[in-house]
Amino acid sequence: MKKLYVLLFSSLLLISCSNNNKKNKLDSSPDAKTLMDESMQRFANAWNQGNAAMLSEEFTIDAVRIISNPMSPIIGKNAILKSFESTFSDESELYKSHIEISVVEARSVSTDIFLGTGIFKILDKNNNVLEDGKWGNVFKYTDGKIKFLLESAHRNSQIQTEAENVSIITNSIDSEALHFEKIKTSVSNYIKYVNDQNAEDLSLLFSENGIQNVSSKEGIILGRDNIRNSEIFLEGQSLNANITGYKYLENSLAIAYGKWSQTDENTGEITTGQWGNLFKIEGENAFLIMESAGLN
């Protein structure tokens, strides 16, 4: 009987230790919303101090910024530092500005990759709005915090340009990187379904809980059904887009970015912008986890 008690006690002790270990792992797992709020607070603090060096430390060494201005991606931490130095220079329209950022959605998509999306507003010292828009970013978790892998932030204001003053969308890059062809197919299908005004097939390019953060829609759209139901196509509009950069992140995740243009065939007006998206590879398909595209 004594042996039985000893065995029971040992078993209970092992179960208790196992449960404690599981609890500790859960407790130590990073919370996406908390990490995102902390990241945005650090970003805002550095911006409001006009501290380019501090801001650049929020990015990984190989991070990419896709923003409304300039009209090309900013690649790598050193280039990102220079971009912030330019933003805070006294020649910049954003000199001595301050920024307000809010988080709409934050998610963990793997053990070390996170996404976030929300809105931003940049104001002058008199609180006049200089620029406002939406953001949808991808982050890498390291040393207890997240850093930008991809910033894709775009202003709401629309700038239309005559056709002769717009750069023609060139062909997409070629790459032998893993799963690149699946991304290329996804982008081609996106263009086709928009131009065919096919909301059903367009929505199926997204994961079931996919996020759409685009300048043509009010707010940030969550979920495939909402993406489909919110599509409004205008007659005479023709979309084109390309891929200018791609990176496979492991764990069936990839980021890609590029340029887009939309032509009004009735007036000749062309609207241009950039996009930076997060994809999930499943079999032969690349599904959009998050689309983040906006105006130049």
Predicted regions and their residues:
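Positively charged n-region of N-terminal signal peptides that target proteins for export
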Residues: 1-4
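Bacterial N-terminal signal peptides
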Residues: 7-14
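Short, low-complexity N-terminal intrinsically disordered segments enriched in polar/charged residues
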Residues: 17-53, 57, 157-200, 204
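Hydrophobic pocket/interface hotspot
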Residues: 43, 54-56, 63, 76, ...
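A mature extracytoplasmic/lumenal domain signature
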Residues: 59, 69, 118-120, 137, ...
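A short gly/proline-enriched turn/hairpin at secondary-structure junctions
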Residues: 64-75, 90-93, 211-221, 234
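Surface-exposed, charged secondary-structure patches
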Residues: 79-125, 228-272
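Short beta-strand edge/turn micro-motifs at domain boundaries
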Residues: 130-165, 272-296
